[in-house]
Amino acid sequence: KNEFSPYAQTKSIAEREVLKAHVPGKMQTIALRPHLVWGKGDPHLLPRVIQRHRAGKLKIIGDGTNQVDLTHIDNVAHAHICAMKAMLKNENLGGNPYFISQGEPVYLWDWLNQLFPRLDLPPLSRSLNFKTAFLIGSGLESLWSLFKIKKEPPMTRFVACQLAHDHWFSIKSAEADLSYKPVIKMNQAMEETLPWLQSL
């Protein structure tokens, strides 16, 4: 939830300002919402997960059945091109946000457990229930704030929510208005990204 993440809060504020600036026929603006971007060169999502697993510090958060959307970087780039072309064709198009993803939600922990053996890592079996993870995140945030530690805590309330809950979205609006279609599917994206992940 946004109230647990300054990053999400500031993105929401920026999006509102961008959409508010839309003036049909004069200045066109839209907002693209790619979800959990990954791929070769990703400095955040998968490298962090892999690093924590190698350090023995990764557990399944929640019951392990949550579905999430991921978006390969090629599809993010393609969505921007689709948006540009759509706005050039229709000067009145704009003022709306569009979710961008693979259009193939995955069971997060199953997906990761299929990946780990290909990186010479064992599948995860240890778990931590969501309420406990959330409370740990809340406590760590308070400690980090009290001692003015700049580095992000190993667990936060926002991360607990992201790792334990469903978060996937319809891309029908992007398909209809922007003619967006994913150019690379999950399986192909993983095969193309795997050599880079193995090199980390």
Give, region by region, the residue ranges found by the protein language model.
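Conserved active-site beta-strand element of glycosyltransferases/polysaccharide synthases
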Residues: 28-31, 59-60, 91-93
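Mid/C-terminal beta-alpha module of Rossmann-like enzyme folds, strongest
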Residues: 86-154, 171, 187-194
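Substrate-positioning beta->alpha
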Residues: 9, 13-14, 42-48, 62-86, ...
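Residue-level signal for the nucleotide or nucleotide-sugar donor/cofactor binding architecture
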Residues: 5, 68-74, 106, 169, ...
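Proline-glycine-enriched beta-turn/loop adjacent to the NAD(P) cofactor-binding site
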Residues: 35, 40
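Amphipathic terminal alpha-helices
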Residues: 169-177, 181-200
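Alpha-helical membrane-targeting segments
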Residues: 48-70, 124-166
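Active-site Tyr-X1-5-Lys
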Residues: 2-33
